[in-house]
């Protein structure tokens, strides 16, 4: 527009040549297109990574304060009354209990470390249904064990496993415990840090492996309605929860997805700098 105004308003004999105007217009258009595409790609990539991290562990987790940063967790008591109280927060969309147990898969030719994550009927499986390649994501239980498991495509390929195979899993505590589980679903998120780690099964099974009471779990996952209110919601729940230990004296610890994955979110933050660099260079 500006280029055309300059061209039309120039005095006779001093008009800028039409090719120069066209080149300027095309250059500006290309620059804007490149800028929009670059920014869109970066923003979309950040959103995709964040959504996958949230898909594996929700926006906020409540666990045992004394638990180390590992998947061999100490339990906390989470009964129905606590679940109802957490669901009453305005920004909380969904609440679900989970338990984890590190172990190993062994086949005739190989073995692989993994984390068995137990979930129950309340688990929101939308994320895994979206990334399911084969089989099904069953409704797992907190009151019975079906000996079924959902595994990632990358782990299945590494161990040469397929849908319907039975796998031998081993867990070390005071002694070695073994469980044979049937693969009923295969998922793929292309987020290798988690794909190479997690198998999903019944909450009941994992609690039995951990020797826990029925209302003891590794923690609670909370999905919120507005990501922009993540920090605010985290501190609100923490203020109400941190000072109230369970019946065994275990203290609760509330952490959000950014606190649980600081390296990944710091890296995503660096991408914002790239956006500004692109904008400055294009201007």
Walk through the language-model features, giving the residues of each.
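Membrane-interface junction motifs in transport/secretion proteins
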Residues: 46-80
């Amino acid at each position: 527009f500006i280029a055309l105004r300059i061209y039309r308003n120039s005095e006779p004999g001093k008009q800028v040549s039409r090719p120069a105007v066209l080149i300027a217009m095309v250059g500006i258009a290309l620059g804007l297109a490149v800028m929009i595409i670059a920014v869109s790609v970066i923003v979309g990539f950040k959103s995709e990574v964040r959504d996958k991290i949230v898909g594996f562990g929700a926006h906020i987790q409540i666990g045992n304060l004394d638990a180390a940063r590992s998947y061999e967790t100490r339990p906390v008591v989470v009964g129905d009354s606590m679940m109802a109280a957490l669901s009453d927060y305005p920004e909380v969309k969904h609440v679900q209990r989970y338990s984890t147990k590190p172990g190993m898969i062994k086949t005739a030719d190989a073995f692989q470390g993994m984390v068995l994550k137990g979930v129950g009927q309340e688990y929101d499986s939308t994320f895994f249904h979206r990334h399911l390649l084969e089989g099904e994501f069953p409704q797992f239980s907190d009151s019975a064990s079906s000996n079924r498991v959902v595994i990632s495509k990358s782990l299945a390929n590494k161990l040469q496993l397929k849908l319907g195979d039975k796998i031998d899993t081993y867990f070390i505590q005071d002694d070695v415990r073994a469980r044979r589980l049937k693969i009923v679903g295969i998922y793929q998120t292309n987020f290798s840090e988690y794909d190479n780690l997690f198998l999903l099964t019944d909450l009941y099974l994992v609690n039995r492996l951990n020797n826990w009471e029925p209302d003891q779990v590794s923690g609670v996952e909370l999905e919120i309605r507005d990501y922009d209110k993540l920090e605010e919601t985290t501190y609100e729940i923490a203020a109400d929860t941190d000072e109230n230990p369970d019946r065994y004296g275990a203290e609760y610890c509330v952490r959000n997805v950014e606190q649980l994955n600081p390296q990944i979110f710091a890296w995503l933050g660096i991408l914002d700098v790239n956006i500004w660099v692109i904008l400055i260079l294009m201007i």
